[in-house]
């Protein structure tokens, strides 16, 4: 990767037993270990569903307690990441996968609540296609914290064969002079 001028970003979702909303101390331990491993391979960031996992759904908006627990866990994780020279990203995912964080704006609000300069928003066009009012607006909303994007079609298939408006996305990225990472995430 280095020879090709590419950067390494590791991505994960927390296992159920350490979802930050329910077990912040477990999440902190898990994320610290993951950050140590990311640093060991020379990654620049750890990102993904670092606040929870796929299947964490209550059918209700997140509670104050859940958000406080997530904030506590990510404050500690961001502090550890900083000691390693790493960035920590937050990927909002759709409501069918979690009730905690579904939009880019919610990720911005969480990052601003935490106040860690080494945290960033990680958008995913698959999830944006489900949750956002428009891809361009989501990109504009997150612009001050946006550093990484998963490019994925609406059906996780071949780009251009689904309903994602790629032109809208790339026009918005040009409008904010996006300099972050783009990763293709396709299940073909």
Question: Which residue stretches match the model-derived regions?
Answer:
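Residue-level "edge-of-site" marker
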Residues: 13-14, 51, 94, 186
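Short, structured active-site "lid" loops
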Residues: 4-8
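Histidine-acidic metal/acid-base catalytic patches
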Residues: 42-43, 101-123, 127-188
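Active-site acidic/histidine proton-transfer and metal-coordination neighborhood
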Residues: 20-120, 130-132
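Conserved radical SAM core fold
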Residues: 14-19, 52-56, 152-156
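Active-site-adjacent beta->alpha loops and helix N-cap segments on the catalytic face
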Residues: 1-2, 163
């Amino acid at each position: 990767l280095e020879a090709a001028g590419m950067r390494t970003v590791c991505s994960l979702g927390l296992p159920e037993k350490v979802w930050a909303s329910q077990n912040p101390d477990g999440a902190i331990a898990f994320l610290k270990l993951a950050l140590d491993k990311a640093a060991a391979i020379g990654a620049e960031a750890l990102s993904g569903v670092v606040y929870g996992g796929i299947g964490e759904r209550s059918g209700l908006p997140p509670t104050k307690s859940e958000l406080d627990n997530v904030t506590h866990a990510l404050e500690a994780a961001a502090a550890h990441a900083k000691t390693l020279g790493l960035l920590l990203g937050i990927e909002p995912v759709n409501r069918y996968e979690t009730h905690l964080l579904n939009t880019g704006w919610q990720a911005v609000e969480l990052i601003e609540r935490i106040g860690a300069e080494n945290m960033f928003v990680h958008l995913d066009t698959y999830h944006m296609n489900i949750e956002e009012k428009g891809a361009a607006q989501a990109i504009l909303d997150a612009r001050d914290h946006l550093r990484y994007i998963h490019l994925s079609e609406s059906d996780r298939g071949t780009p251009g064969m689904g309903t994602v408006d790629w032109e809208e996305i790339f026009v918005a990225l040009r409008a904010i002079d996006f300099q972050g990472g783009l990763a293709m995430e396709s299940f073909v």
